[in-house]
């Protein structure tokens, strides 16, 4: 999708480029479905029909009912909506259990809830960056109203067995709500909603535009759910404000497109990941932070020599675009690596490379070549 062959975009965990066919759907929707879906006249009814079709398409990719799928502006909003709304459905306790490497859009709402009197327990991940499921389950008791975790870590790509966690949580306390942040998992790994009550996804991670996301809200919670927003009746009173129909249609187009290619994309991503891992073996200083069983789209490593920001600036001059941590934590050290117990040098020199189906072996070669140049040049300057 990039027109410049000299540019190598390898930061797809931060955002993806909008697919041309998705952009076409959005452009057409803006011209043809301009009416408010809530309007009672003909064009409004057409917009409502298109909105319902988009909702059904996204719901199919998640395996949920259309009525359980709510459009939002992004994954972060979905997390906030789920967490702040779900806890109000439970009055039997104040306990909340969360993993120690969650996205800020999960961390911050729970910090607010802690100030409001909720008992929030943060469980550190295992040394390999995966959920410590046993430790999380130990904290679940009769007073636990919520357990929150991410399915795929946004910084190192670890894949967590949230299905097992959810099942065990429900076995210990059937009334405990399980929320899953699936922003980095959607269209990368299969999602099973059994025992999961709320789940968030985002458009701009799957080649849809920024500004659109979705929340799965189980029928089990709907009646008691108390959304934090007030206003109109849109999204069945869960999220007021006129729906962004063109972007909802774009999200549906992007999800439908990728759902057809999950297996082939996984094979291609694994090949790129192996190529990068093999190439990094030429640098004895490098320590790989992403375990072998992480999703192949993400590879995080520490080069243990040059600060990330310095290396990233050098690579950017060469039109190689990668990152050091979550884009939502700009300028901040990786809290994921810190939670894993990595030392300060490993954290300060961490680099995240993340792929999409548009990347090629040539992108990996370009990165490795420029990275080698950067190591030589920047070490020479440092001396």
Locate each region found by the language model.
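Pyridoxal 5′-phosphate
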Residues: 1-383
